[in-house]
C-alpha cells in the first residue's frame, strides 16, 4: 500500500471517529435549543402548577413549551429541561432576594410522544394535524441514529479492509459515510425548520430569547467531518485500485 493512501486512510479514520463522538454527544445531550428568560420568583402557585403540568404524562406541546419559555428551558432530541428554584415554598412566597438557588429538572420524551402528531394550533387537538411539523419532528430524532448506524457499519467494513490488507473495500465505507453525512445534514435541517415553524405558531414572549445550543453545533460540525472522511476513503480506495490495475497491465505487457 502506497504511503499516500495509507495516510489518507488514517486521516479518514480519525475524522470518522471524531464525527462519531460528536454525533453521539449531540444525541445524548439536551442543548439543541436553549431559551433565555428572566429568573422567576421563588415559591408561587403558578410555578407549582406549571411544573406539575411540565412533568405530567398528558403534557401537550403547548404546555411544556410554555414552561420552557418561562423557566430558561433547554431541549434535546430526547429530553426537555427547565431551571426552577431549588427550594419551593408553596405555602407563601418568601421575601425577594437578589438571587436564590436554582436546579435543572429534566423530563424525557417517551417514544409515544416522539411519534405523536403535531397540531396546526399547538395544544388544540381539534385544529387538525400539521403533517409537515409531524414528519420534521420524526426525522430530526430518527436520522441521527441512522447516521450513527451507517458509520458503525462503515467502520466494520474498514476493519475488514485492514485485516485483508486491501483498500478497495473502503469504497463502501466512503459511500456509507457519505450517506451518514446526508442523514446528519437532514436531521439538522429538519430541526431548524421545525423550530422556525413552532415559533410561528407559539411566539416567544418579549422578555424571552432563544438560540441553538452546543449540542446542535456538534451535529452541525459532525456532518462536514463525515463528508471529508467519505471523500478520503473513496479517493484512497479508487486511486489505489486504479494504480494497481495500471501496474498489473504494465507487467503483463
UniProtKB/Swiss-Prot annotation:
Listed name of the protein: Claudin domain-containing protein 1
Membrane-topology annotation of the record: Multi-pass membrane protein
Compartment list: Cell junction, Tight junction; Cell membrane
Pfam families linked to this entry: Claudin_2 (PF13903)
Main localisation: other
Transmembrane segments: 5-25, 141-161, 175-195, 216-236
Function: Plays a role in negatively regulating the permeability of cells to small molecules.
Gene behind this protein: CLDND1
Family: Belongs to the PMP-22/EMP/MP20 family.
Keyword annotations of the record: Cell junction, Cell membrane, Glycoprotein, Membrane, Tight junction, Transmembrane, Transmembrane helix
Amino acid at each position: 500500500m502506497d504511503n499516500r493512501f495509507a495516510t489518507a486512510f488514517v486521516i479518514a479514520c480519525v475524522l470518522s471517529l471524531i464525527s462519531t463522538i460528536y454525533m453521539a454527544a449531540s444525541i445524548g445531550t439536551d442543548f439543541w435549543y436553549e431559551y433565555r428568560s428572566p429568573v422567576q420568583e421563588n415559591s408561587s402557585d403558578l410555578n407549582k402548577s406549571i411544573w406539575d403540568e411540565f412533568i405530567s404524562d398528558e403534557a401537550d406541546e403547548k404546555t411544556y413549551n410554555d414552561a420552557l419559555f418561562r423557566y430558561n428551558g433547554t431541549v434535546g432530541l430526547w429530553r426537555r429541561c427547565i431551571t426552577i428554584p431549588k427550594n419551593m415554598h408553596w405555602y407563601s412566597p418568601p421575601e425577594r432576594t437578589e438571587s436564590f438557588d436554582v436546579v435543572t429538572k429534566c423530563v424525557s420524551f417517551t417514544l409515544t410522544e416522539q411519534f405523536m402528531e403535531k397540531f396546526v394550533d399547538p395544544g388544540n387537538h381539534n385544529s387538525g394535524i400539521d403533517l409537515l411539523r409531524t414528519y420534521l419532528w420524526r426525522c430530526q430524532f430518527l436520522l441521527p441514529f441512522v447516521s450513527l448506524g451507517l458509520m458503525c457499519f462503515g467502520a466494520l467494513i474498514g476493519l475488514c479492509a485492514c485485516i485483508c490488507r486491501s483498500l478497495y473495500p473502503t469504497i463502501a465505507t466512503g459511500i456509507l459515510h457519505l450517506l451518514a453525512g446526508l442523514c446528519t445534514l437532514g436531521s439538522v435541517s429538519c430541526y431548524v425548520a421545525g423550530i422556525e415553524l413552532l415559533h410561528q405558531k407559539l411566539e416567544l414572549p418579549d422578555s424571552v430569547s432563544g438560540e441553538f445550543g452546543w449540542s446542535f453545533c456538534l451535529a452541525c460540525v459532525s456532518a462536514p467531518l463525515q463528508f471529508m472522511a467519505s471523500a478520503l476513503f473513496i479517493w484512497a480506495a479508487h486511486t489505489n485500485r486504479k494504480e494497481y490495475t495500471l501496474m498489473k497491465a504494465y507487467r503483463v505487457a
